[in-house]
Structures are given as C-alpha cells and as structure tokens.
Amino acid sequence: MASSNLLVLLLFALFAIPRGLANYDKPPVYQPPVYKPPVEKPPVYKPPVEKPPVYKPPVEKPPVYKPPVEKPPVYKPPVEKPPVYKPPVEKPPVYKPPVEKPPVYKPPVEKPPVYKPPVEKPPVYKPPVEKPPVYKPPVEKPPVYKPPVEKPPVYKPPVEKPPVYKPPVEKPPVYKPPVEKPPVYKPPVEKPPVYKPPVEKPPVYKPPVEKPPVYKPPVEKPPVYKPPVEKPPIYKPPVEKPPVYKPPVEKPPVYKPPVEKPPIYKPPVEKPPVYKPPVEKPPVYKPPVEKPPVYKPPVEKPPVYKPPVEKPPVYKPPVYKPPVYKPPVEKPPVYKPPVYKPPVEKPPVYKPPVYKPPVEKPPVYGPPHHP
C-alpha cells in the first residue's frame, strides 16, 4: 500500500509542479468560455415506417355441428337383369385390317375476299439517276433526216400534247406556235451533231404524272431516211446557252399516315404562374372547355391499418332438429315379371381370314404335345 501511494504522489507531482510554477509577471489571460449556441439540426425526416400488418392467424372457428340428416333409405327394387347370354364359342381375336380411309374430300371453303383497304403509299421519290451522257460518235450515226413536209421537227399538236406547263411566275412556258414557226432547215452538209454537255444542262426531271405519255402514231412515222451521200454536217459552234433554269419540281407532299401516338402522359408539373406583362402581350385566354382538367394523381394515402376486431366466435348451439320421421310407406313392391328376352342369335360376322405373311408375324408354334 505504501509503495502504491508513493507512486501516485510522484505522478501527481510531475503533472502539478510545472503548472504550479507559473509565470507571475504575466498572469494567465482569463478566457471566458465561448458560448456556442447549440446547433439546431433540422429534424431528420423519417418516413413513417409502414409496419406490415401483423399476421394474425385466422381464428379457427369451431366447426358448426350439423347433425347428420338421417335420410330414409331409398327403396330401390332389385333390378332383375336377365342372364347375359355368353356364347360358349371362343371367338379368336378378330383381326381388323387397317381400314384405309380414302382422303375425305373437303371442298375448298370459298372464303369471301378479305377487303384490304388500299394502302396509300406515298409516291416514292426516286432521285434522277445521273447517267453519264452516252456519247455517240457523229460518224457512225449520221443525223436522222426528218423531212420537213411529212413530219415537222418537234411538232407538238395543241390537242394531243399540251405544252409543258412551267410556272408562269418563275418562267413562262416557251410557247412554240406550230403554224408560225417554220421548220428550221438545217442543211445536212454543215450540221454537226449538237453536243449538249451534261454538266451545263441537268437532267430534266419530268414527273410521270404531269407529263402525259407521248403518243407517237406508228403510221405517221416515216422510215428513217439515210442519204447515201455522206455529207459533212454543218459545223455550228456550240452556243453557250445559259443553264436553263427549271424551277424546282414541286414534289407532292409525301403522305405520311398519321402515326397514332399514344397520348404522352405529362405529370402535372406545378409551374409557377407565368407572368406576362399586360402591355407587351395580354395573357392568352384559354377557354376552360379546351383546356383539359389538370390531372392530379390521387395522393396515395397509406392504408389505415385497422386491426381486425377480434369478434368472439358467436357460438350458436346446434339446433337439434329431430329427424323428421316419415313412416315408411309400405308400397307393395311393383312386381315386374322377368322380361324374357330370347337370346338374339346374331349370325357370326364372317370376316375373311386375313393372310398374315410369315415375315411380318410368324405363327407362334407351341411345344409338341407327346401323348
């Protein structure tokens, strides 16, 4: 005990003496305790713990005693079955060959033609395939001589083929009067093949609908006249025609069937009222009829758990109904004389013996009986 007390005193002296030897010239500055207000932590929201309903085993109600209803025995007179006639002849198992039924002819059911509404496919726009211009050398193919009398060059009768309609605003249709314009006489000697560069003139896209088919009567077309004398065609320098501006073909609007999109459910976002100044723009008045009612999803209230009221099982004492005693009506048994049905002598159905080849099923031979 003494040694332990000394050790405690020494340890106390080691910690207390340095603090006791304080500097009296500079007394320690008293620092009042700083008041720290308690940090008010917001209450942590703990969602209500939805306690699962306590499983209470179903109260086992005692079985209601139902006294057995004593039904009087129903009198069933004994059915006197006539003796079944069993012929003593042991009929061998009748082999019924597989009846090959002919295929039952089922007349083709004439289904009425299912009406399929014509699918209105929008006209598929096929961009004009830029085919490179097929260069035909002028020597091999001389210019086709078209006699001016029989068939004027590019004679477009006003009835058979109307002039190509070009929008009058952008470019009026070039009207070539068939009467006033004489056939351009191109001497066959100095006429070179007119080379139309494919770059300067884009391929003319003529929609098949707007342009009626050019009717070329086969009778009026004279045979191609090939002059025997190969006269050199007159060389005309290529006139640099400005690129013919053809207005963009107004493509018919591609009919896209209205895709029946399901109504996009937008949850009612509680938007703040949009402030629209009355001077710049008055608030758009939307009649209440056109505006659908703002769908507010029903607040899913947790189901109020009402513990099942444990009603004590109503004990209904078994009503003892005395069995209704019905005295047995002594009905005399209806005597039915035994109806004698003579045994119907059915002639044995003759079935031709089916030949069974030994390959399919060899005959079963029993052991030889030795007397």
Swiss-Prot record:
Keywords: Cell wall, Developmental protein, Repeat, Secreted, Signal. Residues 49-317, 339-371 are annotated as: Disordered. Residues 1-22 form the signal peptide. GO terms for cellular component: extracellular region. The keyword Isomerase does not apply. InterPro entries: Adhesive_plaq (IPR002964), Extensin-like (IPR003883), Proline-rich_CW_protein (IPR051308). One of its GO terms (molecular function) is structural constituent of cell wall. It is found in: Secreted, Cell wall. Residues 32-366 are annotated as: 67 X 5 AA approximate tandem repeats of P-P-[IV]-[EY]-K. Sequence repeats lie at residues 32-36, 37-41, 42-46, 47-51, 52-56, 57-61, 62-66, 67-71, 72-76, 77-81, 82-86, 87-91, 92-96, 97-101, 102-106, 107-111, 112-116, 117-121, 122-126, 127-131, 132-136, 137-141, 142-146, 147-151, 152-156, 157-161, 162-166, 167-171, 172-176, 177-181, 182-186, 187-191, 192-196, 197-201, 202-206, 207-211, 212-216, 217-221, 222-226, 227-231, 232-236, 237-241, 242-246, 247-251, 252-256, 257-261, 262-266, 267-271, 272-276, 277-281, 282-286, 287-291, 292-296, 297-301, 302-306, 307-311, 312-316, 317-321, 322-326, 327-331, 332-336, 337-341, 342-346, 347-351, 352-356, 357-361, 362-366. Expressed in hypocotyls, roots and mature root nodules. This is a developmentally regulated putative cell wall protein. PANTHER family: PROLINE-RICH EXTENSIN-LIKE PROTEIN EPR1, REPETITIVE PROLINE-RICH CELL WALL PROTEIN 3. Belongs to the plant proline-rich protein superfamily. ENOD12 family. This is Repetitive proline-rich cell wall protein 2. The gene is PRP2.
